[in-house]
Amino acid sequence: RTRKLVTVPYMNQSLSGQSEYFLKIQFCLKEKMPWADKGYVVAEEQLLIKEAGSRPAISEVASSGKKLELSGIKPGDNIVSVKGAGFEVTFDKSAGSIYSLKYNGEFIITEGNGPELNALRAFVNNDNWFFSSWFDNGLHNLRHKAISHYIQAQENGSVILSFTVESQAPNGAFISGGMYSGKNRIEERSDRPFESDDFKFVTNQIWTVYQDGSIELEASITSNRPNLALPRLGYVMKVPRKFGDFTYYGRGPIDNYSDRKSSQFIEIHKNKVANEFINFPKPQNMGNHEDVRWCALT
């Protein structure tokens, strides 16, 4: 073994104040070996040189442009429309979420496929201690109902749509088949409908639509069973199949997790959406990427 001090030739003063910077170090074979070609990476590491600086709030950079057109806010109207230069987004008052979204006349979210709160995933081997409770509490069949709303055009030109949404299943269910059988059956307990004190989420959702077409969601999610272990918590939505190219800035390209991620570096990665799926014989964790700064579908 030998040691050597190497000076990396970069200038601190040339770095952007808002950007983050990493240094990637690789040790490669100098010549072809029986087991690998010349240039094969034997070891590598990524070092953080500088963290990203604070960026302006979206309200500071997205508030310029033509005044937004707001309609559908009268009592009895169920669909609210917000139109701007080159885009239109509609909201379903009864669900408290986006109903459809178009940019330049092209649907990005088709009618009825907007974001919904979701707390379910397929169970894997490590879930044998608690997966039955997901179905007992109806996580597989949440129904979303806005119980109040507030809509207002702001002085800065944006539009705010605030909803309180209750998410609860009609009833619980029993899942049979166990963890390892490969076959499971969900039996709905429709004879025992849920009441107000059964499990539910209550979410305060604030949507802000800006003149340039940016849409921001702030969500505060609570439940009446704070000790219930959830398999996941987030939002799901459907987009047209043609958006099959996936680009993200985060750890990759191999899927990684909070306890197994350091081998995958933070870079801009590109993949097909279909290639993020691995067809395991039984459900297993896959497709996750840690420390993602942004992602895009095209």
Where are these regions (language model features)?
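Intrinsically disordered, low-complexity Pro/Gly/Ser/Thr-rich segments with frequent PxxP/GP/PP motifs
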Residues: R1-C28, K32-D37
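Terminal amphipathic helices with adjacent charged low-complexity linkers/tails
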Residues: Y40-V42
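Beta-strand/loop-rich accessory regions of lumenal/periplasmic or secreted enzymes
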Residues: N12-Q18, M33, L47-T298
